[in-house]
Amino acid sequence: MPKTEREYRQDIVDVGRMVWQKGWVAANDGNISIRLDQDRVLCTPTQVCKGMMQPDDMIVCDMKGNKISGTRERTSEILMHLTVYNLRPDIRSVLHAHPPVATGYAAAGRSLNLALLPEVVIGLGCVPLAAYGLPGTPELTDPLLPLIPKYEALLMGNHGAVCYGEDVYKAFFRMETVEHFARISLVTELLGGAQVLPKQEVTKLLEARTRYGIRTRAGLEFGCPLAAEELGQERFQVTREEIIAMVYEAMCAQK
């Protein structure tokens, strides 16, 4: 049974609070929306802390961004949300936030495009980086246009991240995965570099999506994520017998 508009408003309140509690937004950062139907979108207002919203704070606007109802002004970045909905009819919710580590990668001009974690390869493929665009203007959306149809989560140059999904909780969980992936990626760099999965394993993971009921095509035809072979990495693999032989030779050399 479809949710009521009131229930959707409460969903945005709940997700906004979780985003704020996790430290993915500061002050009035971030915005959230849910597509109510073909003609209307429910979105967060501008200039409000996402951890302190109430259901009645939300704005209903049309697919051109014009306010239909609400006592506050809509988010200034509604165009980004509408662009996602126009390019992806399967999407019902969009979440934009500034998770610190993922945003650090975006500010450094770095995408999260390596095949490091099975869960990320299966669920997101990878998280590409879109060029910087001035917030609150069409310049913000333009760099996203070629990427939105291909991926489920994007980094935004010097800005943050945007995730979208079939509902607001799916968008939230994708944002959580992006930040988790960014933190692990950073740790691998601090430890001297990542051991990237080989192409054969990436292919197996992408094929496993059907088994898990995951419908995204990210990573299947767009050159992302990058496997070990594409980075010139060779995975060092030896058998148990070879290890024993190497240890024996090393011990003999010390005599």
Locations of regions flagged by a protein language model:
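Glycine-rich flexible loops
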Residues: M1-K255
